[in-house]
Amino acid sequence: MYTQHLSTLQFLTFVAFGVVVLAALWRLLPGKEPPVRTEPYPAEQLAAHDRRLPKYFLAGGGFLVLGSLHMVVKNLPWVADWLARAGYPGHLVRDLSNTHVMIIGGGTLIVSGLTWYALPRMVGRPLASEGLAHGAFWFTAAGLLLFYVALVANGIAMGRLVAHGWEYEAAKEHMGKLYRVPVGMGAGVMGIGYWCFAANVMLTAFQGRLVRCPKPTGHLWKFLGAGAAGLTVGTVQGVIQVQPAHADWLFRAGHAGEWIDPISHAHVNLVTGLTMLTAGVLFYLLPLLGAVPPSRRLANACFAALLGGSLAFYAAALYLGFHEGRLVVEGGLTPEQAEEATPLHAVLIMTGGTAMLLGFWLFLATVVRAVRPARGPARAFVLAGCGALAVGTLQGPVQAFPAVNELLERGGEAGEVIVNLHAQLNMLGGLMVILVGLALLLLAELGVREWPRHARFVLKPASGGVAVYYAAGIALSAVAASRVAGRETYGQAVAALEPWQALVLVPAALGVLAGFSAFAAA
């Protein structure tokens, strides 16, 4: 790559990443023999960052409320009809922006707070850098807010052009820097926040090796390390693929390019990243639930199965995206022809998907076995989240079957909505519900406030709303997909389902909004 081919945004992104790497190396490679500590750190030093943890949960709750409100608005009849007719820009507004604000804003910020509580106690030393912890919070929150606003605003602007007959590529070119600059800046700033988080996790764990004292939960840090590494890889990939040339290549690759974005990008962020972090803090906090944590051997088995399965699927998706995308972009094949020309397509997807499913189910079985006898107040949150994850992870291999995958492809955008609902159930109904319960539990443990009496108004509306939204969304999207396969446009198919679609999805989204609003208020 030549420097004259770098945009200013790319250059600044690489500089910021280099600064974080150099700072980490500076801490990892001291000029003299590092001192070994044989006495445990005092509890007050390990808890130095605890008083700042509520801001992570408050900000996460705020983003969850914003995302839930977005869910309500996008399912109003006239809004849903317009978004369906807006083509790919409608997807930016309907799905991409909504997913990012809830999963990154809600999930990542909440799990960051839980990580800063658990990690020092796992490795036996305080956080390596308070500055990196603050930077991770503010860069992630600010970058996400900019990214969200940029996607919504540009999606609406480009959607109006597409609705008047423009092609998406022409509409995107027409927006020019109004699209590229804020989206790229938002992604870059978010990436810096994630890199600060990952650097602090790695530095703290690395320096923890110098503390030579008993660490009963020391084996759990690798969940947090792997999760931080997964988020780093995912954000680097995200920054790269929003660059104009790469985004254009992915768009021209069509369905083949979707194996790279959103599939591989989402999986490395959400499974290798967020799920591993959630597993680590959940195993650590099990005693607060009144549960017995799994043995070191079983925890290590869960780690190996989750990490191996997620990386197997990530590698398979990346390979198929680049290989089949090249056949489409350079070879002139259609995505369907490129898939047929790849004999290993089904084998790779089924192998990676099955490995990931087995890893998830081993983790879920371990958690349910530990939590079921417990009587702690967060028990219901964990069990509800595990139930949603069991259903959501089962859908993944099912939709990878060639016959099912072909039906989804024939359904066009309606088929893509079904795939998105699978991820939404896993994240909102699964991991997010678990994280919300753990955050409320930790606030009570820290003495910030007692376990809220209205906690049931968090769990029941949120879990119930996500469940209804998922089931109804699958059924309605299946009907829309059959209409699209019958030569209707997606906009016509959605219009034919109104107002019945809104009568089901809007109340379900309101339930999600009520549940997460109760959490934010707590």
Q: Predicted segment positions?
A:
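Hydrophobic alpha-helical transmembrane segments of multi-pass integral membrane proteins
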Residues: 1-522
